[in-house]
Amino acid sequence: MASSPLPGPNDILLASPSSAFQPDTLSQPRPGHANLKPNQVGQVILYGIPIVSLVIDGQERLCLAQISNTLLKNFSYNEIHNRRVALGITCVQCTPVQLEILRRAGAMPISSRRCGMITKREAERLCKSFLGENRPPKLPDNFAFDVSHECAWGCRGSFIPARYNSSRAKCIKCSYCNMYFSPNKFIFHSHRTPDAKYTQPDAANFNSWRRHLKLTDKSPQDELVFAWEDVKAMFNGGSRKRALPQPGAHPACHPLSSVKAAAVAAAAAVAGGGGLLGPHLLGAPPPPPPPPPPLAELAGAPHAHHKRPRFDDDDDSLQEAAVVAAASLSAAAASLSVAAASGGAGTGGGGAGGGCVAGVGVGAGAGAGAGAGAKGPRSYPVIPVPSKGSFGGVLQKFPGCGGLFPHPYTFPAAAAAFSLCHKKEDAGAAAEALGGAGAGGAGAAPKAGLSGLFWPAGRKDAFYPPFCMFWPPRTPGGLPVPTYLQPPPQPPSALGCALGESPALLRQAFLDLAEPGGAAGSAEAAPPPGQPPQVVANGPGSGPPPPAGGAGSRDALFESPPGGSGGDCSAGSTPPADSVAAAGAGAAAAGSGPAGSRVPAPHHPHLLEGRKAGGGSYHHSSAFRPVGGKDDAESLAKLHGASAGAPHSAQTHPHHHHHPHHHHHHHHPPQPPSPLLLLPPQPDEPGSERHHPAPPPPPPPPPPPPLAQHPHHRGLLSPGGTSCCYPSEDSSEDEDDEEEEQEVDVEGHKPPEGEEEEEGRDPDDDEEEDEETEVLLGDPLVGGGRFLQGRGPSEKGSSRDRAPAVAGAFPLGLNSSRLLQEDGKLGDPGSDLPPPPPPPLAPQKASGGGSSSPGSPVHHPSLEEQPSYKDSQKTKENNQVIVSTKDDNSFSDKNKEHSFFITDSDASGGDFWRERSGEHTQETNSPHSLKKDVENMGKEELQKVLFEQIDLRRRLEQEFQVLKGNTSFPVFNNFQDQMKRELAYREEMVQQLQIIPYAASLIRKEKLGAHLSKS
């Protein structure tokens, strides 16, 4: 706060900028210890607010309830309690007599039954953690605390605050062995000296070091004690944010932030990129400091920042601020379209700030304003609890991701990777400036550009997945990122958009988080944010994408909710630029989420997409099933090379379709590098991605595809392309089930039902049957989409196209000829898609509707799908109901275990059932021979079995749907729901396993026969 430029907040919060508390002011009322009489009433001025004090046991204590109701009124009791516990502040209950005194003194309401009293010093620390500058205590550079603990045989060491930059930092040097330990580990480290007595650690758990680690000096000076308290509070629960104070970022000042929201927004605008960082925190940080942060963040700050991402859990305000800020930032960015942004920001409660910011044109300002504003009104409510429970604290943990805190991977590379993406929040100004796409923030553009370039600016949640925890974006470096997170990248954008938009949007944003497609859907659903993106998307470089106006916006929304949307498109249009921008990392591409605004920005598919690109090898698609790794992808690529007819070309293609895809380009473009990206798509004209071929308007929906995109080239389709992470399996799934191996990849895609029962016959996926219930994705066309996304993502671009085709005509090709199926089927399911070649894309688009980009609920779903899938999917996707984004059951005959799970995903509209079973990990084992064998299999028998299974699955699906409730499946609010749904599906599938052995034996026989005949 000290650095906060706003006098208002400063006056309110702290009299003296240098220190949160003004000792004089604080001690002024205090008479003097000698004179303290029991139950003596006094008054202490905390942050300019008079607080009643009472002398209890010779100590002046303040009424916690009064502090909570005045200074901390913007924070929930829960937040305050958690922070108090985290700070190790014990509350003394006052006696009935003391309570009456407090009531009469006006500190407590008459109805109060009890009151906790805390010392003045504790009150100062508590308020400071919420309102004060959140910087670690100022200590000499080479300062170290002499600390010791008595656990086990005890130990002594030097706690070096300068090294304490994360909760796990090795900052304690053992005095005996001179090794460095983290505080958590140090209490378990002891040297058995002759005189040492063993002490059973008293419930020494990893976070109890603050209780066990004591200053060795028994009577330390007060300054030392206070500094030690501050240090101990650093990465602890609520005050965690204080851990990595940025020069310009004072994330802790939430109230201030709300107060300062408007001023800060303006300041942030002034500060430009720098402002973003500060604002990123609460919009409260003074603009001056913020500017440094951006650079610092880029350069060295990343250390702090990237560590910082351990956002306070308790710090609700922070969390809210982060989420809200991210949302509002994102909204602000989205607010590129000022209207949308303003609306979003306003919604947050930081609305005024957000709107103001939007007006200002500074994404950062907007973010700050929104965040701060939200704070004031208490953004807390704005963020549905999903943040807390459903994502296992993801929200809390990664609100920063949302944009409050530096991205967990804040290293510059990450900045490069995500900055583009996050830039989208800046979208309006920054992103556009960067992308030059549009012209959302004229004035802010320059600054925005900067911010977009640097974490600080981009960090708004736009570029970050709001919940890094579950979906850390794949970094360019290939940091492994669990794909199961789905489209984390989207969340940021979607989150930002949604958040910015309104609580409802917020909710959708969360859903999006849960389901990449969902996010897209929700974003789409929320045109306001989407539209701005739409503009951007069309503007930036989305030559093909623009065609789908709505799509663009939606895409953009999904991809780069606010300003990035254009980026996605543009990325698609300028894949090369993307790749360049990506800088060798899909991350960069993903990062360029805002690419929308800056065409060059990598298509900014999702971070996920980026991940895919970046962490090609890591393609954990589903939480449940492993997906083939790079090797698989490569082998698949090889397989496809021939069958797909040019995986390499696909590469370029991907770009194209993706492009057309709009965001689908996400799928591929992000990873143009992947040779297999979109072999199949190749059929489509690059320009008119299948998506395009399909109803062009729908293509926009594909934003989710980004994931797929990467997956495309990444055999690991982390997100399964289409669906969330789960779909990843798809991509792994062997998108290469190309016709080459006419596996029984029956992508049954019921055209009418939009059912994409893709029977994954992924060669690579022998038992890859990833039953990846793409719950999240829930692309009705999972098959197509899945292929688009999953397949496309997978190295088996071609197969993936095929799959879509198959999906198109689910009954049609088992896999007699994936290609044929693809083309033929294509038309079939995707009646939308006019030409078969496009069909692969189109059907994905069409029949898959969102399949290609599961994330995009609105794929031009196939005919029937389109409407129902679109709407339903939108909702569903938003809700993440679409379980099976990758419907293909790829049963890869490779492993005799070809999975036949054709899981019908929930019908989005209820219309289509997608099979959720994804292929299991695609196995790269002898994919070629197996493929051929499978081709030679008794296709008829297999088809029969498969169809039976599909029927069964469909029935199950329906029952499941009924059980689940309305078709829109709002049920899929969160990750846990998703998991439950997936598990339920799995159980159902297990019941179907009886069929599998039969089919498996058939396949085995066929394979044996084929082998014999071949040999």
Swiss-Prot record:
Cell division is among the record's keywords: no
Record GO terms (molecular function): chromatin binding; DNA-binding transcription factor activity, RNA polymerase II-specific; histone deacetylase binding; RNA polymerase II cis-regulatory region sequence-specific DNA binding; sequence-specific double-stranded DNA binding; SMAD binding
Family assignment from sequence similarity: Belongs to the SKI family.
Location of region: Disordered: 280-316, 518-934
Main location: nucleus
Gene Ontology biological process terms from the UniProt entry: cell development; cerebellar Purkinje cell differentiation; negative regulation of BMP signaling pathway; negative regulation of transcription by RNA polymerase II; negative regulation of transforming growth factor beta receptor signaling pathway; positive regulation of smoothened signaling pathway; regulation of cerebellar granule cell precursor proliferation; regulation of dendrite morphogenesis
Ranges of compositional bias, category Basic and acidic residues: 628-637, 793-803, 861-877, 885-899, 912-922
Keywords: Cytoplasm, Nucleus, Repressor, Transcription, Transcription regulation
UniProt key word Transcription: yes
Localization annotation: Nucleus; Cytoplasm
Ranges of Low complexity composition bias in the record: 575-600
Compositionally biased tracts (Basic residues): 653-669
Any Pfam family matching the protein: Ski_Sno_DHD
Phylogenetic placement of the source organism: Eukaryota, Metazoa, Chordata, Craniata, Vertebrata
Function: Exhibits transcriptional repressor activity. Acts as a TGF-beta antagonist in the nervous system.
Bias (Acidic residues): 730-745, 754-774
Protein name according to UniProt: SKI family transcriptional corepressor 2
Compositional bias (Pro residues): 284-295, 670-684, 694-708, 832-842
One GO cellular component term noted in the UniProt record for this chain: transcription regulator complex
Tissue-wise expression: Expressed in cerebellum, spinal cord and testis. Isoform 2 is present in cerebellum (at protein level).
Subunit structure: Interacts with SMAD2 and SMAD3.
Alphabetical list of CDD domains matching this protein: DHD_Skor (cd21080)
Highest taxon above the source species: Eukaryota
